[in-house]
Swiss-Prot record:
Organism lineage: Bacteria, Pseudomonadati, Pseudomonadota, Gammaproteobacteria, Enterobacterales
InterPro entries: Cl-channel_core, Cl-channel_volt-gated_ClcB, ClC, ClC-type_chloride_channel
Species: Escherichia coli O157:H7
Family: Belongs to the chloride channel (TC 2.A.49) family. ClcB subfamily.
Gene Ontology biological process terms from the UniProt entry: response to acidic pH
The entry's keywords: Cell inner membrane, Cell membrane, Chloride, Chloride channel, Ion channel, Ion transport, Membrane, Transmembrane, Transmembrane helix, Transport, Voltage-gated channel
Function: Probably acts as an electrical shunt for an outwardly-directed proton pump that is linked to amino acid decarboxylation, as part of the extreme acid resistance (XAR) response.
Name under which the protein is recorded: Voltage-gated ClC-type chloride channel ClcB
């Protein structure tokens, strides 16, 4: 047992450095090509001229597509093993390391050029790759899946500053394939990754700063649960839209570079209306949580951002949709809260409360992982007073979504790329 905990610690350290490496590479490219040192792609887009704002995501998608197509032609074969940590966990615990690194580099290109795709997907993949590389060198084959799971959980902890949620995400996704005893190393890796990441970044701040002064009352629990029902209906709709957009792009029968460029061009066009469509949505989420906008502003940004996410994911841009899903959930919750706020004197607090609830419940509805979703929002914001209500709402959202749409966002993604 001591041996496993020691390896879990090493995996956590490796994962933290993998995530930090990707983050610093992203910041470097943003500084070189966008003259942006704020770390916010929305700020970068705001400061660009309209023609650069239009073309930059398209050029980034084109470059990523050329890289992926060039690698496939160079090797003259498709990847001989998984290039996704979820697939590796569901098969024999091995990666195609070279193809996975190329995929991560392609993700770096589309992320830094403004596509509405999550950067954390590549971060978690790199963390899992580092764990897998170490495991194949120093551990027996039957443990490889465990250490990939530890690496993925550690990557999520370092990226989202949510070690418990990262650990439970792995446990919920792998329910039935991992023994409960295996959670120990997973949690150790996640916590170590968070601590090392804090040391690297010289900060232990929460991912999102929220000033929620409301004390949750019976009325608020009713509103939280009703938001869970709404998210349970919206989750399957979002997954259906993503699948339809993916099939639409595939039906065009474009070469990968042009397909990714088209997705980027759509994001560029939308950014002419609002630069908030650039990036994974992190900075927009923070601005909404700091000062919830008016109903029509939320609705406008929501529609543009939703279309940008659908275009980016549908075109096959390498990256995650975890953080974009958080923004969509926040917007849905805030739209609902703003509508209800017309009849309540504390409309601002209700809007913020239901925005946080929307983040958790839509995440639960799309991942079918309610416990992870609840803990993730609490860990990212520090609002642990919401935990009981969020847990009930997330379970309801997950049950409704699973009834209407059997596959989670991860199973759907695997099916699309298999």
């Amino acid at each position: 047992m001591f041996r496993r905990l020691l390896i879990a610690t090493v995996v956590g350290i490796l994962a933290a450095f993998a995530v930090a490496g990707f983050r610093h590479a992203m910041l470097l490219l943003e500084w070189l090509f966008l003259n942006n040192d704020s770390g916010s792609l929305v700020n970068a887009a705001t400061n660009l001229s309209p023609w650069r704002r239009l073309l930059t995501p398209a050029l980034g998608g084109l470059a990523a597509g050329l890289l992926l197509m060039g690698w496939q032609k160079f090797t003259q074969q498709r990847p001989h093993a998984p290039t996704d940590y979820m697939e590796a966990l569901q098969t024999d615990g091995q990666f195609d390391y070279a193809a996975s690194l190329v995929k991560s580099l392609a993700s770096l290109l589309v992320v830094t050029s403004g596509s509405a795709i999550g950067r954390e997907g590549a971060m978690i993949l790199l963390a899992a790759l580092a764990a897998s590389c170490f495991a194949q060198r120093f551990t027996p084959r039957q443990e490889w899946k465990l250490w990939i799971a530890c690496g993925a959980a550690a990557g999520m902890a370092a990226a989202y500053r949510a070690p418990l949620a990262g650990s439970l995400f792995i446990a919920e996704v792998l329910f039935g394939t991992m023994m409960l005893a295996s959670l120990g190393p997973v949690i150790i890796s996640a916590v170590v990754a968070l601590l090392v990441s804090n040391l690297i970044n010289h900060s232990d701040a929460l991912l999102y700063s929220v000033q929620l002064s409301v004390t949750v009352q019976a009325r608020d629990y009713a509103l939280i649960i009703s938001t869970g029902v709404l998210a349970g209906l919206c989750g399957p709709l979002l997954l259906t839209l993503m699948n339809a957009c993916h099939r639409g792009f595939v039906s065009l029968k474009l070469a990968p570079p042009w397909q990714l460029a088209l997705g980027g061009l759509i994001v560029g066009l939308l950014s002419l209306f609002t630069p908030a469509v650039w990036g994974n949505g992190y900075s927009t989420v923070q601005s909404f949580l700091t000062a919830p906008p008016l109903l029509m502003i939320i609705a406008g940004i929501f529609l543009c951002k939703l279309c940008a996410v659908l275009a980016s994911s549908g075109s096959g841009a390498p990256g995650g949709v975890f953080t974009p899903t958080l923004f969509i959930g926040l917007a849905i919750g805030m739209l609902y809260g703003r509508s209800l706020g017309l009849w309540f004197p504390d409309g601002e607090e209700i809007t913020l409360l239901l925005g946080l609830t929307g983040m958790a419940t839509l995440l639960a509805a799309t991942t079918h992982a309610p416990i992870m979703s609840t803990l993730m929002i609490c860990e990212m914001t520090g609002e642990y007073q919401l935990l009981p209500g969020l847990l009930i709402a997330c379970v309801i959202a997950s049950v409704i979504s699973r009834t209407l749409h059997r596959d989670s966002i991860y199973r759907q993604h695997t099916a699309q790329h298999s």
